[in-house]
Amino acid sequence: MEGFDFNVIERSLGYLFRDGMTFTVTLTLIAMTSGIIFGTLLAMMRLSSFRPVSMLAGAYVNLMRSIPLVLVIFWFFFLVPYIGAWILREPQPVRVGAWLSAVITFTMFEAAYYCEIMRAGIQSIARGQVWSGYALGLNYWQTMGYIVLPQAFRNMVPVLLTQTIILFQDTSLVYVISATDFLGAAAKVANRDYRLVEMYSFVAVVYFVISYSLSLVVKRLQERIAIIR
């Protein structure tokens, strides 16, 4: 196509995937794992009969779900160094870096969404199963760990994966703190070689292929879970 040079993509593939996509996938996996763990804890807090705990978790979830992600990224990027200085009793802000700030941001932000998913999963389990656990001599935490959470997690796997696809796409926002994710790496190449259309078109195709492929996996899981039920 006249005026376009798509060879720049081939020349930059190594950098884009070695540095950019590795950053994106690693951040996605870490934020997914830690976000689900923290989100499950938040879900249990929201379902707690102790009202102050339930209200605290609810306030956190509502706060995170009401603020644009890009603002949360900025907030943690500039705030975490001061929190680190306070914890370590340092006179100056602690140097944290874009990577750690991104991990903390996405863990804290996505936990609010994973919380609501896990809360729905826990509430979908028949109350009788909880009482059965107590009848067997299990305490609350054992009942949740051995009976309720495994079933809730299995039921919610498709929804959790759907949220993870959104998380994968949202990681592209870390470019605002100069992190070199897949989009950030493409932006550097685009600005260096003045090939914005070519690079951003390629990035869009890659995100579409990965996200659409994962959505097909989610659909297949939903069908399998429906059959098991």
Question: Residue spans of the language-model regions?
Answer:
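Transmembrane alpha-helices and adjacent helix-loop boundaries
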Residues: M1-R229
